[in-house]
Amino acid sequence: MGLSDGEWELVLKTWGKVEADIPGHGEFVLVRLFTGHPETLEKFDKFKHLKTEGEMKASEDLKKQGVTVLTALGGILKKKGHHEAEIQPLAQSHATKHKIPIKYLEFISDAIIHVLQSKHPAEFGADAQAAMKKALELFRNDIAAKYKELGFQG
């Protein structure tokens, strides 16, 4: 299910827009995730108390987490599918420490797509959306395979 060179080019061109404002994109992605899927908040001790979008946007911890998430994802995307070294520790921590279900990775992938559509409609057309969805699915599938190796039924 790999991506073509052209698809990776679209993914990385779009990701360049994210990198121009990682804090802003990260906050938007997490707020979208938590408002769309409030159950995901339970996996974050620092955010469990945040109930409204305003509270979420005011949280410095949430902003920092958004930067952490998108910085890690950017590093993985730049590997163009050759991300074994990056995926292993991420899967390990998400399976054994954080216990993050794969479904939640689907939710955040959807939030990322939504944010990119909202913030960059001209640059994030159908081809770029399809390529990004494919790249995020590859990431999730590889995390899921590692989860299975670790015996985590996430």
Curated annotation (Swiss-Prot):
Binding site for heme b: H94
Residue positions where Phosphoserine is found in the record: S4
Modified positions (Phosphothreonine) in chain numbering: T68
Keyword line: Cytoplasm, Heme, Iron, Metal-binding, Muscle protein, Oxidoreductase, Oxygen transport, Phosphoprotein, Transport
Biological process terms in GO annotation: removal of superoxide radicals
Main location: cytoplasm
Residue span(s) of domain Globin: 2-148
GO molecular function list: heme binding; metal ion binding; nitrite reductase activity; oxygen binding; oxygen carrier activity; peroxidase activity
Catalysed reactions, as listed in the record: Fe(III)-heme b-[protein] + nitric oxide + H2O = Fe(II)-heme b-[protein] + nitrite + 2 H(+); H2O2 + AH2 = A + 2 H2O
EC number(s) recorded for this UniProt protein: 1.7.-.-, 1.11.1.-
GO CC term, one of those recorded: sarcoplasm
Gene3D superfamilies registered for this protein in UniProt: 6.10.140.2100, 6.10.140.2110
Subcellular location: Cytoplasm, Sarcoplasm
Known role: Monomeric heme protein which primary function is to store oxygen and facilitate its diffusion within muscle tissues. Reversibly binds oxygen through a pentacoordinated heme iron and enables its timely and efficient release as needed during periods of heightened demand. Depending on the oxidative conditions of tissues and cells, and in addition to its ability to bind oxygen, it also has a nitrite reductase activity whereby it regulates the production of bioactive nitric oxide.
Quaternary data: Monomeric.
Family according to the record: Belongs to the globin family.
Entry protein name: Myoglobin
